[in-house]
Amino acid sequence: MNLYRLELKRVCKTRMTAILLAIALVLAVVMAYLPVTFIGWTELDASGNKVSYTGLKAIRKRQEQQVSGTITPDVMQEALEAYQRVYRQYDASSINDIPVEVFYKELARYQPLVNNAKEAFADPKTGMAPGMMGLTAEDMQNFYSQLPKRLESVIWLEQDGKTGYEQAQAIAQKKFDAVQKPFTYSFGVSPDAMDYQTLLSLLLTLLCAVIAAPVFASDAQTGAQDIQLCTKNGGLRLAAAKLAAAFSITGAAYLLCGVVWILVTNALFGWESTQTSVQWLFSVTSLLPYTVGQMEWVMLVANFLIFFAEVAFVLMASVWAKNNLTALSVALISVVAPMIVYMVVPGSFGEWLSTLLPAGGIGFSNALQYKMINFDFLYAGGYAFFQADVLLASAPIKIVLLVGLAAWGYLRKTKVA
């Protein structure tokens, strides 16, 4: 325990660690605030002039105007009828034919509902959404019964021809059966905000990789490790203390910043929006059985597992590195490696490799969030595996394996010494 406290104190007292932790905390607040600036709203004042709002004011205005609560088939029908009435009034063929002031006054509150209805009733063979006048009141009453059919067509469009396609279809349908219906909706937390949670995860991983990289390598660089390895407690006990201290500091930083992001985001966008069904935010056929608020916490914990696996790899690399520069280079490359592999290596091999790398699931297009909301499957031996499930199932295995390799590597040095 004394070794652990001393190591904890040693790492925390370095100027670089303090600076990086401060940057991480600032990033959490900035990443929560930035999506707020993307929100806009326009309305007419008492004189008939257009008034535009952005940021927090726009959020509050939209929350006052837009539909919220449980989205029943009757509410869907009400939205369609409002749209079709205005379309007929202006002989419009698209939303661009509607005067802006009319759109914001009569239709904007219904826009999310109508967009999702068009997605649900898209052509099963082409994926093309129908025109506004192509939908009927009966369609709106059958909105929820249409969703499994839409899901089936999406899987067919994206996965047909792959060995194991039928299994992918079955997995998707089983997951979607667990989604609670009817959906709920309240304007607030946006898809952009959730994207920034993913970006924050990447940035925190990079910062913490920099913190963890010198934990073992700095002693090797200065020669202190040669002395430590010859002492009574310089073997497994010291290795365990260093590993525990590094995990404690980086883990606490990641969780603190993640919680700050969630609290600030929900405070800015409004806590009511945390009850919105994930399907209303991304796609009506998303497989996640969560509300937005639940997804925020699920993503924090899930990304934390992957983050922990990456830190374990960085520490393992630090054990074998002879100087800080080598350890830092390996650490940074390992964080971005899954993104590069995902973009450069084609086919099933590239998908599996980007998934199984230590930082698999952290990044941009390869990020866990997008694997959870999209229909990305991995195929092997005629079987289909939901990629998000593979990412989450493999993370604990990576952690145990990499921590074990780090300890084993340090013990080997002890024997050599």
Give the ranges of each region predicted by the language model.
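Junction motif at the cytosolic side of a transmembrane helix
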Residues: R5-R10, M316-W320, A393-A417
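Aromatic- and glycine-rich beta-strand/loop motifs that create alpha-glucan
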Residues: M1-L21
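Secretory targeting signals
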Residues: V26-M76, A82, D139-D219, A240-W320, ...
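Central hydrophobic cores of alpha-helical transmembrane segments
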Residues: L21-L25, L325-P338
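Hydrophobic transmembrane alpha-helix segments characteristic of membrane transport
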Residues: D219-D226
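Short hydrophobic, aromatic-rich alpha-helical segments embedded in or entering the lipid bilayer
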Residues: E351-D376
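Short helix-to-coil transition segments within interhelical loops
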Residues: L229-G235
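N-terminal, intrinsically disordered, polar/charged segments of Gram-positive cell-envelope systems
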Residues: F38-L135
